[in-house]
Amino acid sequence: MPVASKLLLSILLPLPLLSLAAVAPAAEPPAAPAARMTSAECEVWARELSFAQSVADHDAAAFAAHLEPDAAFAAESPQPQRGRDLIASRWAGLIEGKTLLLSWYPSRTTIGGADDVAVSSGPALYEDLRPGADPRYRIGAFHSVWHKGADGAWRILFDDGIEPQPASDAQVAAFRQGRKPVCPQG
């Protein structure tokens, strides 16, 4: 068979298979493997949960205690909030929780080559408490960089997140069911 014919056949023969693949139902992607963290990463996990609890408890002093003095929030924005005092001031209304509740939890914490720096990330749920709020719930995500101080305490150095989007009842339920109170150490 001439080379041109072999080339044409090699191109045309797979086409029916591609057509079948296009109409076949897509398989669900495999579930992501569960995160397994070191004991040091679990310290950061616990600290992230403690930070979230400070907002849930409307405790401004505990919130501020989780921040490095020179922390930067909205770190990827053109005008980050810089410094513990400014951040605590800007978050005061959110910490009060009178019109908006924010809750979050880590889904992953990671420590790399520097044992005093860690990254945490996970989902965040915003609940608008105003009567008739639409949407009532919005889901986003956060990512934080933690620094372990000379006193051994982990504090946030940088924080940012993903713009929240309206959330369905199923997404809200999945968020609430996804919180793990114990770090998945492995």
Language-model segments: residues:
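N-terminal secretory signal peptides that target proteins for export/translocation
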Residues: 1-5
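A beta-strand edge to alpha-helix "cap/lid" segment located at domain peripheries
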Residues: 27-65, 72-186
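Boundary at the C-terminal end of the N-terminal hydrophobic targeting segment
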Residues: 21-26
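Bacterial N-terminal signal peptides
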Residues: 9-20
